[in-house]
C-alpha cells in the first residue's frame, strides 16, 4: 500500500498481521524499516527482492518489529541498524518493563507479555548503532534518525522528506494515539510532543494505517 500525498520517494507498506514493515525506495536504492514476525518472513523477503534493499533499520527491539532481522540480513546480505539502547532486549524482550494506563492498553500489554514469554528472537549483532541526527544517505535514501524514547529506551524514528516512520512511539491499532505501552511514560509523552511540533508531515506507524500528523499531547 502506498500513501502518495506529499511523497517523492516510493513508500511500500508491508502488512504482516497487525505489524507494518516499510520499504522506502528512491531510484535504485531502498531501505527496509522493521522486519515483522517470523510467520511473515517469506512474504517480506519476496517483497524485498523487488528492490535493491541496502539496509535494515529497526525502530526498536520488540520482537514483532525485529524477529526477522537476522534472517533477512543473512538472506539479503545487508547490515542491520538500530539503537544500542535496545540491545538488552534482543535476548529477552522482558528486559525493559512495560506499563499501560488505558483499558485497551492493558489488553495489548497482556498480549505482548504473553508473546515475550512464548516467542524468541534469533540473535543478531547490528552493524550500525544509530543516534539522533544520523544520516542514512550513504545507503541511497535521504533519511535522518530521530530519537523517540519512551515506548522503549532506544525507540527511534526515521524521517524521510515529509514522512516520519515512528515505530511504536505512536500507535494506530484501534485509533491514532500516543503509545499505549511504554517503558517511560514521561519520555513517551515528550517524544509525542516533539512529533506534534514537526507540523504537516505524514506519520507511518508500526501498527495501523498512516495518518497526517496532529497534536498528540497538549
State the predicted function of each range:
Residues 2-51, 157-169:
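Conserved beta-strand hairpin/beta-sheet module of binuclear metal-dependent hydrolase folds
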Residues 24, 34, 44, 60, ...:
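Divalent metal-coordination and catalytic microenvironments
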Residues 31-33, 57, 80, 165, ...:
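Residue-level marker for buried hydrophobic side chains located in beta-strands
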Residues 37-38, 84-88, 170-171:
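Short, acidic/turn-prone active-site loops that include or flank metal/cofactor-
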Residues 40, 128, 183-187:
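Soluble or luminal CAZymes and related metallo-dependent hydrolases
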Residues 52-75, 132, 146, 181, ...:
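Soluble, non-transmembrane catalytic domains of enzymes that act on hydrophobic metabolites at membranes
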Residues 135, 141-216:
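Metallo-beta-lactamase
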Amino acid at each position: 500500500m502506498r500513501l502518495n500525498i506529499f511523497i517523492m520517494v516510493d513508500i511500500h507498506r508491508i502488512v504482516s498481521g497487525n505489524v507494518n514493515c516499510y520499504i522506502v525506495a528512491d531510484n535504485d536504492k531502498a531501505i527496509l524499516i522493521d522486519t515483522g514476525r517470523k510467520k511473515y518472513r517469506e512474504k517480506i523477503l519476496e517483497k524485498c527482492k523487488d528492490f535493491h534493499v541496502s539496509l535494515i533499520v529497526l525502530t526498536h527491539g520488540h520482537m514483532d518489529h525485529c524477529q526477522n532481522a537476522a534472517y533477512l540480513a543473512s538472506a539479503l546480505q545487508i547490515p542491520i541498524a538500530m539503537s544500542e539502547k535496545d540491545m538488552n532486549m534482543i535476548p529477552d524482550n522482558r528486559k525493559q518493563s512495560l506499563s499501560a494506563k488505558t483499558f485497551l492498553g492493558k489488553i495489548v500489554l497482556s498480549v505482548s507479555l504473553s508473546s515475550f514469554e512464548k516467542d524468541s528472537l534469533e540473535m543478531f549483532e547490528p552493524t550500525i548503532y544509530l543516534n539522533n541526527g544520523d544520516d542514512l544517505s550513504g545507503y541511497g535514501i535521504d533519511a535522518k534518525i530521530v530519537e523517540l524514547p519512551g515506548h522503549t529506551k532506544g525507540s527511534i524514528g526515521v524521517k524521510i522528506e515529509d514522512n516520519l516512520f515512528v515505530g511504536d512511539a505512536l500507535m494506530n491499532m484501534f485509533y491514532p494515539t500516543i503509545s499505549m505501552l511504554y517503558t517511560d511514560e514521561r519520555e513517551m509523552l515528550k517524544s509525542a510532543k516533539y512529533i506534534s511540533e514537526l507540523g504537516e508531515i505524514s506519520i507511518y506507524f508500526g501498527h495501523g494505517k498512516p495518518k497526517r500528523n496532529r497534536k498528540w499531547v497538549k
